């Protein structure tokens, strides 16, 4: 009797769960990076499925910058309490003491100190030898050429010219002391796959993904949400209310909203079917300079 044929989403789910289970079995001290966005929410859901009815056998790590949307932090804490996973948070103490922020120091310096260096500090502090990330190959060109198991040296650096072959979904997780692997279970998913899976599995998300009236400032052709009193206005700028949503989430001064009426999963999926713009066009850190994402990854960014 022929076996039941899996749907496209079921195939992706099975592949991701297999990767998560393999890493948990193969590595001594894995961790799942939790950025609180839609991809992290899907990855968390897959990890819960992978080990159900038991608990996730590794912690989740959120590298905080001090500039995430308030709704993101509230959602993070609610999810940890609801599902009972171990949540670790880290913020770069040196950057915090220096008052590093995206307004006064710029996106490149802020991202390097508070995200890249903060991540490396946390990985070193806890001695993690494998770190799950929610990146997908369709997001950005440097991620398109990265392996599922992405080898990092003792300094957490990625060398795109020195990647290990992955034939027939066979992954090489051999590392020496101090080295590590970044693991991307969602590598073969697309943005549309993510949204359709969220709809299918009824996965909770930060409300910022759904259209609503929000206070924003138009800056450089982008809509930046005034999330708290630290928002700095340039001369002539005014805060106004617009119906917007976010396609991607990060530090609020570096993440642009988009005009949208999509206030439900069905409407977001319909919008995704029609869009021709890049998912990361709202991430201001990607426009620092040419090939900036690859340079960040070479330095240790996830």
UniProtKB/Swiss-Prot annotation:
One of its GO terms (biological process) is sulfate assimilation. It is an enzyme of class 2 (transferase). Its EC number is 2.7.7.4. Pathway: Sulfur metabolism; hydrogen sulfide biosynthesis; sulfite from sulfate: step 1/3. CDD domains: Sulfate_adenylyltransferase_2 (cd23946). GO terms for molecular function: ATP binding; sulfate adenylyltransferase (ATP) activity. It catalyses: sulfate + ATP + H(+) = adenosine 5'-phosphosulfate + diphosphate. Residues 280-302 are annotated as: Disordered. Keywords: ATP-binding, Nucleotide-binding, Nucleotidyltransferase, Transferase. Gene3D superfamilies: HUPs. Belongs to the PAPS reductase family. CysD subfamily. NCBIfam families: CysD, PRK05253.1, PRK12563.1. Heterodimer composed of CysD, the smaller subunit, and CysN. With CysN forms the ATP sulfurylase (ATPS) that catalyzes the adenylation of sulfate producing adenosine 5'-phosphosulfate (APS) and diphosphate, the first enzymatic step in sulfur assimilation pathway. APS synthesis involves the formation of a high-energy phosphoric-sulfuric acid anhydride bond driven by GTP hydrolysis by CysN coupled to ATP hydrolysis by CysD. This is Sulfate adenylyltransferase subunit 2. It comes from Shewanella sp. (strain W3-18-1). The gene is cysD.
């Amino acid at each position: 009797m022929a076996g039941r044929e899996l749907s496209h989403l079921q195939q992706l789910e099975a592949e991701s769960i297999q990767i998560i289970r393999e890493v948990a079995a193969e590595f001594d001290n894995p961790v799942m990076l939790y950025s609180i966005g839609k991809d992290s929410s899907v990855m968390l859901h897959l990890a819960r499925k992978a080990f159900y009815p038991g608990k996730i056998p590794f912690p989740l790590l959120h590298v905080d910058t001090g500039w995430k949307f308030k709704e993101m932090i509230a959602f993070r804490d609610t999810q940890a309490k609801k599902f009972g996973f171990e949540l670790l948070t880290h913020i770069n103490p040196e950057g915090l003491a220096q008052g590093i922020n995206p307004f006064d120091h710029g996106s490149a310096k802020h991202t390097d100190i508070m995200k890249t260096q903060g991540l490396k500090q946390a990985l070193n502090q806890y001695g993690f030898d494998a770190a799950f990330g929610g990146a997908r190959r369709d997001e950005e060109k440097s991620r398109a050429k990265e392996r599922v198991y992405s080898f990092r040296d003792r300094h957490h650096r990625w060398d795109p010219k020195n990647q290990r072959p992955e034939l027939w979904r066979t992954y090489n997780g051999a590392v020496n002391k101090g080295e590590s692997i970044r693991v991307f279970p969602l590598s073969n998913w697309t943005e549309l796959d993510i949204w359709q899976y969220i709809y299918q599995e009824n996965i909770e998300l930060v409300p910022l993904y759904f259209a609503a009236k929000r206070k924003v400032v138009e800056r450089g052709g982008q809509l930046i949400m005034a999330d708290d009193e630290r928002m700095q206005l340039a001369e002539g700028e005014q805060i106004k209310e617009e119906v917007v949503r976010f396609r991607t989430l990060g530090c609020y001064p570096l993440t642009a909203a988009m005009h949208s009426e999509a206030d439900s999963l069905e409407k977001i999926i319909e919008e995704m079917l029609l869009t021709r713009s890049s998912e990361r066009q709202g991430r201001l850190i990607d426009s620092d300079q040419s090939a900036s994402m690859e340079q960040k990854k070479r330095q240790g960014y996830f």
